[in-house]
Design a protein with these regions (language model features):
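Aromatic- and glycine-rich beta-strand/loop motifs that create alpha-glucan
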Residues: 1-26
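Membrane-interface junctions
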Residues: 11-15, 75, 94, 98
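Secretory targeting signals
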Residues: 26-89, 117-181
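Alpha-helix N-cap/helix-start motif at helix boundaries, enriched for small hydrophobics
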Residues: 112-116
Length: 182
């Protein structure tokens, strides 16, 4: 089983399409970070609307690494599953189109082991992609924008999450994203 998993991981990570997803996501995140670095205060003023009249807010402190990561996670909610589906679909269909799937099923390995190895290899890919997103969006945003409390707009108002209570929430968010994509 371990050999099958190694083979599947090799097949996934030798294709340029795999690294294209990493590059697209990195470029997307860097564009968001650049836009918020240049115009973050205006964006935050737009998002919070007329609350400036009722509350005294320092918009420069609201645009921080946690807020940028929150924004990135909400934007990538749609894009990442599409990239994962492309790679995951290619794991089986690419093998079938090349004709090697029939050859593989004729070997003394059960079909369950083959599919399980493909599933686990896809899980490793998803984990690597989410780890890449976490590093690029959270670590780089914290390095560039710093840390402060996170203000989240909800339907019934604003919620302020203190900076010492945020990091574990991001770990759970990435964990739940991993579960959702599997």
């Amino acid at each position: 089983m371990w050999n099958l998993l190694q083979i599947e991981l090799f097949k996934i990570f030798k294709k340029p399409r795999t690294y294209l997803a990493f590059a697209i996501i990195a470029a997307f995140i860097f564009l968001i970070q650049l836009g918020l670095f240049v115009n973050g205060k205006d964006w935050m003023m737009f998002m919070l609307g007329s609350l400036d009249e009722t509350m005294n807010m320092e918009y420069d402190k609201l645009v921080n690494g946690y807020a940028v990561c929150f924004f990135v996670l909400n934007l990538l909610l749609v894009h990442v599953p599409i990239l994962v589906a492309l790679v995951a679909g290619d794991v089986v269909s690419g093998e079938a189109s090349m004709g090697t799937l029939r050859l593989l099923t004729s070997k003394p390995v059960s079909r369950t082991q083959i599919i399980l190895a493909k599933y686990l290899a896809t899980a490793v890919y998803v984990f690597a992609l989410l780890l890449w997103i976490a590093i690029i969006s959270l670590v780089v945003s914290i390095a560039v924008f710093g840390v402060n409390d996170l203000v989240v707009a909800k339907t019934n108002g604003l919620q302020l999450i203190e900076s010492n209570d945020i990091l574990w929430r991001y770990f759970f968010a990435f964990g739940f994203a991993f579960i959702a994509m599997m």
